[in-house]
Amino acid sequence: MSMSDPIADMLTRIRNAQGVQKASVVMPSSKLKVAIAKVLKDEGYIDDYAVQEDGGKAQLSIGLKYYAGRPVIERIERVSKPGLRVYKGRSDIPQVMNGLGVAIISTPQGLMTDRKARATGVGGEVLCYVA
């Protein structure tokens, strides 16, 4: 059976794993999921990520990060969904928690944070908010 929204599945797996204090979470891999994991690592929300080949199917393993026993990611939510895509121009890119959080945006130059998209002067599809 095919999954209708693999990005929402990825975010839900991360949210659920952090809710039960797991050290890492494993999921099916894709180029977009790896790019999201790279942005999360660059912003300091996860420890590390790795792609492992498991019998012909690539698996993405994400090492979760905690501070003082609490998850570093307090909120992670999908914005643009398959049924309702959300696109923002360069002047309409939202701030998450007045700049304390991050919006991950898919642009023609690849995936990037809201701050980098504003600095670059590009808009795109708002995939998710992380705080």
From Swiss-Prot:
Gene: rpsH
GO cellular component: ribonucleoprotein complex; ribosome
GO BP annotations listed: translation
Assembly behavior: Part of the 30S ribosomal subunit. Contacts proteins S5 and S12.
Superkingdom per UniProt: Bacteria
Species for this entry: Cupriavidus necator (strain ATCC 17699 / DSM 428 / KCTC 22496 / NCIMB 10442 / H16 / Stanier 337)
Classification via NCBIfam families: PRK00136.1
UniProt keyword rRNA-binding present: yes
InterPro entries: Ribosomal_uS8, Ribosomal_uS8_CS, Ribosomal_uS8_sf
Pfam family, one: Ribosomal_S8
PROSITE patterns: RIBOSOMAL_S8
Full protein name: Small ribosomal subunit protein uS8
Matching HAMAP family: Ribosomal_uS8_B
